[in-house]
A protein has these predicted regions:
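Short, hydrophobic/aromatic-rich segments at coil-to-beta transitions
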Residues: 244-250
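Short alpha-helical segments and helix-capping/turn motifs at coil-helix boundaries
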Residues: 17-21, 75-78, 142-148, 213-214, ...
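Conserved redox-cofactor binding core of oxidoreductases
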Residues: 113-230
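Glycine-rich loop(s) and the adjacent beta-strand/alpha-helix scaffold that form part
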Residues: 28, 39-49, 206, 222, ...
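N-terminal glycine-rich phosphate/pyrophosphate-binding loop and immediately adjacent elements
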Residues: 1-118, 277, 292-305
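Short, well-ordered loop/turn elements at secondary-structure boundaries
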Residues: 6-7, 28-30, 78-79, 84-86, ...
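Short, glycine/acidic-rich beta->alpha junctions
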Residues: 15-18, 142, 208-212, 262, ...
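A glycine-rich dinucleotide-binding beta-alpha-beta segment and adjacent secondary-structure elements
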Residues: 7, 66, 197-200, 234-237
């Protein structure tokens, strides 16, 4: 086979938690990396101020809605997931919980390996450091009401504040103030502390939420990773039978009213478009395009999101 002139060493599909971590760690190893994201790239000021601003809140591009929140409906569930550079980190509730033992001990996990808890333990610490995990001590009348209800039904001990990925002020009266990077010894972006506005799931306009643009993607771009928004992958084809020779990726780019389709070649591909992006894409490649026929028939089973 002739030597292939690859466009990239690795193409990462999706810019959420999985894609951003993959891109950063690959770039640290010296690989040339491209992130493809079907949604838009936003500055903090571009997030909507209300979910009634449907064009900037919801993702329904066929209706002209190019927001951050996509709804996927199945026969049993309604799933909300993030779209845009930063993925779900833009609009999730910031809560950082380590699963209880019952999760690690469930059959879906233990039939693969028995030591998940110990295996993952050091990586939870690393993720917490990168995402700026801190305990949210703020409570209001809604929290007080929940605490009272829990007490009335005999579950008072279950009430607690949670760890979140938000930059909180270190002293009362300093909410919203600008501070030099508080997480990476001054090597990361400057931040403003939380003003407790409650707009976390609309998108933080105040530079306080520790979205992936403030950490993993920030350092990825500094390492030379390229991020292409408005770029949706429509086909993945291995260049030989098992993909060892690399892959061709067909991309549909939508910028404004302009649409173009082009192909890229890379040594490897990382699919990290979230459960509702990655699983349907793999099913499509296996069953419709038949470019990835060796994907397991178990794809889509035992899924957690």
């Amino acid at each position: 086979m002739n030597k292939i002139d690859f466009d990239y060493d690795q193409i990462v599909i999706g810019s959420g938690f999985g894609g951003s971590v993959s891109a950063l760690r690959l770039s640290e190893k010296g690989y040339k990396v491209l992130i493809l994201e079907k949604g838009l790239r936003r500055e903090d000021k571009d997030f909507p101020t209300t979910n009634l601003d449907t064009k900037n809140y919801l993702w329904r591009p066929e209706l002209g809605f190019r927001g951050t929140m996509q709804f996927t409906f199945t026969s049993k569930t309604t799933i909300l997931h993030g779209v845009g550079v930063g993925g779900g980190s833009q609009i999730y509730a910031n809560v950082h919980l380590i699963p209880p033992d019952a999760v690690f001990e469930s059959e879906a996990w233990t039939k693969i390996r028995k030591d998940w808890k110990e295996t993952l333990k050091p990586f939870y610490g690393l993720a917490q450091r990168m995402l700026g995990t801190a305990n949210n001590t703020y409570t209001n009348i809604a929290d007080d009401t929940l605490k009272e209800v829990a007490s009335e039904i005999g579950y008072a001990d279950s009430f607690k504040t949670v760890n979140t990925g938000v930059f909180f002020s270190q002293a009362a009266g300093q909410e919203g103030q600008l501070a030099k990077d508080p997480y990476f010894n001054g090597d990361g972006p400057d931040r403003n502390s939380c003003i407790y506005c409650g707009a976390c799931m609309l998108g933080c306009r105040n530079n306080a939420k520790n979205t992936l643009m403030k950490n993993y993607l920030y350092f990825s771009e500094r390492n030379g990773v390229e991020i292409r928004p408005s770029s949706e992958v429509v086909k993945i084809t291995p260049l030989n039978e098992d993909g060892r020779a690399g892959y061709e990726v067909i991309v549909k780019e939508t910028l404004g009213k302009q649409v173009r389709q082009y192909s890229l070649q890379s040594r490897g591909v990382v699919l990290s478009a979230g459960v509702m992006g990655t699983v349907p894409m793999l099913l499509k490649m296996r069953d419709q395009h038949k470019t990835l026929p060796n994907i397991s028939s178990l794809l889509g089973q035992e899924v957690r999101t």
